Amino acid sequence: KEDMIVLKKSEKMLSINDAIQKLIDSLKKITNDIIIVSDRDKVICSTDKNFLNENIDERVINAIDERKILDGINFKVGKKVIEGKFYMSPVIVEADALGSVIILSNKEINDKLIILNNVINVIISMKLY
């Protein structure tokens, strides 16, 4: 019986990851920028499949822990440094910081990208609640 409960939780998480992946793939068509969703230390969904399961930038891990928005230049994914600008917001559900939404861009981070990041974040938070 305990195995069934664990399996149901795993199935739910898999379906959430699938839904998030479809969402960010669709939104990439609007922006052409890279969108990454992470848990507390690894990429779980990305519009660039090369980043899946890679460790996220240490600055993002700290921002998740501190529940802070972060923006900057040159983002590290695994051992690769992606040149350009990034904007990250932590995914917070019931006061728990669970991960992040990150947009990587080769242009300035504008209001449209910030709003897009926030929309993705809200949808993920609602799915996990």
Indicate residue ranges for each PLM-predicted region.
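Short hydrophobic/glycine-rich mini-motifs in sensory/regulatory modules
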Residues: E2-I5, V91-V101
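Short, ordered loop/turn segments at secondary-structure junctions
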Residues: S10, R40-K42, K49, N106-E108
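Juxtadomain coupling helices with adjacent low-complexity linkers
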Residues: K12-L27, N55-E66, G72, L98-S100, ...
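Short loop/turn motifs at secondary-structure junctions and domain boundaries
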Residues: S26-K29, K79-E83
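Regulatory sensory and allosteric helical modules in signal-transduction proteins
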Residues: R40, S46, L52-K80
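A short beta-strand signature within small-molecule sensing/ligand-binding domains used
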Residues: V81-I92
